[in-house]
Regions:
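Positively charged n-region of N-terminal signal peptides that target proteins for export
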Residues: 1-4
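C-terminal motif of bacterial Sec signal peptides marking the signal peptidase cleavage site
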Residues: 12-15
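N-terminal glycine/threonine-rich, aromatic-flanked beta-hairpin/loop signature
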Residues: 40-81, 86-87, 112-114
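Hydrophobic/aromatic beta-strand elements that line small-molecule binding cavities or substrate pockets
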Residues: 42-46, 69-74, 99-108, 118-119, ...
């Protein structure tokens, strides 16, 4: 019985994660400054499985309303590369207006990162309607006091 209990405790803790084991790990929660975004401040969460989430206030764009972003990332040497996508809705008609994909590349330095990001826009049929040149992207890790 004790062995079974010990096994159950070990298995339940197997999925638990603490702070990143590497000081330059992207895994964690970040306050992000994207100077070219309609609303420049965002929250990013990078998960250990290569997925990520993005959120920011919806008030930055008067024409479209956007969802939270969901995306993917990979380590490439000492750099992080990734992309997230959000759904766009027309504020007047309340209809699907397309998507925006934001590609990024950055380098993590302990509790900060610096890099660039570049958006691409797609209409409701999935046809690219525009893109922008890369602009600065910086982040500060959310830490406990």
């Amino acid at each position: 019985m004790k062995k079974l209990l010990a096994l159950l405790v070990a298995l339940s803790c197997a999925g638990c994660q603490g702070a990143p084991s590497h000081p330059n790990s992207i895994v964690g929660t970040w306050f992000v400054d994207d100077v070219a975004a309609p609303f420049r401040y965002h929250m990013y969460v990078f998960n250990g499985d290569g997925t990520m989430q993005q959120a920011n206030p919806d008030a930055g764009d008067a024409t479209t309303s956007d969802s939270d972003g969901k995306g993917i990332w990979v380590a490439d040497g000492d750099r992080i590369k990734g992309k997230w996508m959000e759904i766009l809705a027309d504020r007047t008609t309340h209809k699907f207006a397309g998507t925006m994909e934001l590609s990024f590349e950055m380098k993590v330095d302990h509790d900060g990162f610096a890099g660039t990001s570049a958006p691409r826009y797609f209409d409701i049929a999935g046809k690219e309607t525009g893109s922008e040149k890369p602009t600065p992207l910086t982040g500060k890790r959310l830490t406990l006091p």
